């Protein structure tokens, strides 16, 4: 009987240790993806961005980060926005120095010089908005 009790206690301790180890490990960051432009806007608003929906931009959001002065346009990435970006690049309307940054589910347009880009990307990454496929939209 005592032998069984000892085994049960040891099993319980082992199980508790495994649970504790599992709860301390963090899953790999996969980024935040959005099902729609509205979901993206809600996420931005709840994460310190001041955002206003602008239907003239095809439902994009003009956003500023709290305390910042730079305006960025966040737009849900769809087939339409991807084809528009490609057309802007080909026509020379889009800045070819990396100001237009695209992810799989969102697009960032800075409207500012290259010196602003690192700070914007740092803020976006710190907020977990990266989706693992951030690329320059123009080569």
Label the predicted regions.
Residues 32-96:
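Short, solvent-exposed recognition patches
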Residues 75-139:
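Extracytosolic low-complexity repeat regions of secreted or lipid-anchored proteins
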Residues 14:
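Active-site-proximal loop/hinge segments that shape catalytic or ion-binding/gating pockets
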Residues 22-25:
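Bacterial signal peptide processing site
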Residues 29:
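Substrate-binding/charge-relay-adjacent region of secreted/lumenal peptidase catalytic domains
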Residues 17-20:
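C-terminal motif of bacterial Sec signal peptides marking the signal peptidase cleavage site
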Residues 1-10:
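Bacterial N-terminal signal peptides that target proteins for export
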């Amino acid at each position: 009987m005592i032998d069984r009790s000892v085994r049960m206690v040891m099993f319980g301790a082992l199980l508790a240790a495994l649970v504790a180890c599992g709860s301390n490990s963090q899953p790999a960051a996969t980024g935040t993806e959005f099902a729609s432009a509205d979901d993206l806007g809600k996420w931005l608003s709840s994460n310190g961005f001041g955002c206003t929906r602008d239907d003239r931009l095809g439902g994009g959001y003009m956003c500023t980060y709290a305390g910042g002065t730079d305006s960025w346009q966040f737009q849900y990435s769809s087939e339409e926005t991807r084809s528009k970006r490609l057309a802007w690049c080909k026509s020379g309307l889009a800045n070819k120095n990396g100001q237009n940054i695209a992810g799989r589910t969102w697009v960032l347009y800075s409207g500012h010089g290259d010196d602003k880009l690192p700070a914007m990307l740092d803020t976006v990454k710190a907020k977990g908005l990266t989706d693992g496929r951030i690329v320059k939209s123009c080569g």
